[in-house]
């Protein structure tokens, strides 16, 4: 648990709530807890040069005061490194006009009397010359996680060499790979190297549509972008697009601790599979990039619906092992729909 960014956030927020409640009661002041980051963020093109940013608040089931009162819209223009405020609204959408053909990026920050939430993921847009239907970029890389771990008899620890996990934004706490896995070695158990002490480890920045959008812009197209949550919820209709770029990055299904909280960060959820199946059946073009695009489907609690999606929509099946059964798909031995190994 301790190395998982989501767990760190949960613990940190719990401590913050406890301190805030103590001070509120001691000083007889109103208690308002800062909001959670917004969800289902999306950018849609309403008409030429006109766009709408939309999102939804994220309720805190443990704290009813944590609902936002308003939202701050932050923007970054092409060539800029930082964001600047362009507006506020109490609604869950914000309309704007774009008068150029540059790439513009946006974040939404929820706030109330308790303070500011963490910023949303970063989405981007570009208005192309003419009035072409934009490409839709879907950010499906939402994963943040600890390194892989294992327990095997007297040995246990982290398998960071197999799966390093994904820090939130960046990590400065990693000192080196674990070297002592024997649980009977007393205080030496868990010892790790120190050759990464001065290194900053890159994590999930939640800021990828602008990178993909630059390549799309170089090809002469405009684009809008959406969180995968907005697609799964139906807020974004795929039927309005001809081309989709799905970013999966290091997305990969996994569990936290004993797994009671369920499977997280699956590359293709049942609803996403359904939406993409309909989109491709209607003639849409789909480009997918990521580290575990197919292997994740066949490697972690997959069902017949997952296999059908992989075979029919993605056009791949796992290669058969010589003795029968399925090979480890992580080997890269996949068959395209025409039966050739890829």
What function would you assign to each model-found segment?
Residues 84-91:
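Short beta-strand segments within Ig-like beta-sandwich modules, predominantly Fibronectin type-III
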Residues 1-26:
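Active-site-adjacent mobile loop/cap segments within catalytic or ligand-binding domains
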Residues 251-342:
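A glycine-rich, often tryptophan-bearing local segment used as a flexible ligand/cofactor-contacting loop or short
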Residues 1, 141-145, 230-232, 249-254, ...:
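Solvent-exposed loop/turn segments at secondary-structure junctions
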Residues 69-73:
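Short beta-strand elements bearing conserved aromatic residues within extracellular beta-rich modules
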Residues 121-242, 247:
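Aromatic-Pro/Gly-enriched surface loop or interdomain linker
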Residues 96-116:
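Beta-strand-rich modules
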């Amino acid at each position: 648990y301790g190395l998982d960014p989501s767990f760190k956030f949960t613990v940190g927020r719990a401590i913050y709530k406890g301190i805030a409640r103590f001070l509120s009661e001691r000083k007889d002041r109103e208690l308002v807890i800062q909001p959670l980051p917004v969800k289902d963020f999306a950018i849609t093109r309403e008409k030429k040069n006109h766009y709408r940013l939309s999102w939804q608040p994220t309720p805190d089931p443990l704290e009813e005061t944590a609902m936002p009162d308003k939202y701050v819209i932050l923007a970054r223009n092409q060539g800029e490194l930082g964001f600047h405020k362009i507006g506020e609204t109490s609604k869950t959408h914000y309309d704007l006009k774009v008068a150029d053909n540059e790439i513009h990026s946006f974040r939404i920050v929820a706030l109330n009397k308790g303070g500011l939430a963490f910023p949303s993921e970063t989405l981007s847009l570009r208005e192309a010359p003419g009035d072409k239907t934009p490409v839709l970029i879907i950010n499906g890389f939402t994963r943040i996680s600890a390194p892989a771990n294992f327990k095997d008899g007297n040995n246990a620890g982290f398998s960071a060499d197999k799966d390093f996990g994904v820090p939130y934004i960046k990590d400065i706490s990693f000192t080196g790979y674990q070297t002592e896995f024997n649980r009977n070695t007393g205080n030496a158990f868990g010892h790790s190297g120190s050759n990464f002490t001065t290194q900053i480890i890159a994590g999930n920045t939640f800021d990828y549509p602008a990178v993909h959008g630059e390549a799309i812009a170089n090809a002469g197209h405009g684009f809008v972008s959406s969180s995968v949550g907005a697609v799964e919820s139906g807020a974004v209709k795929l039927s309005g697009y001809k081309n989709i770029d799905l970013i999966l990055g290091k997305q990969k299904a996994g569990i936290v601790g004993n797994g009671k909280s369920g499977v997280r960060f699956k590359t293709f959820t049942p609803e996403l599979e359904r939406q993409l199946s309909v989109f491709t059946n209607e003639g849409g073009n789909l480009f997918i990039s990521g580290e575990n695009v197919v292997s994740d489907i066949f490697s972690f609690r997959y069902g017949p619906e997952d296999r059908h999606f992989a075979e029919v929509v993605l056009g791949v099946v796992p290669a058969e092992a010589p003795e029968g059964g399925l090979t480890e798909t992580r080997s890269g031995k996949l068959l395209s729909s025409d039966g050739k190994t890829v």
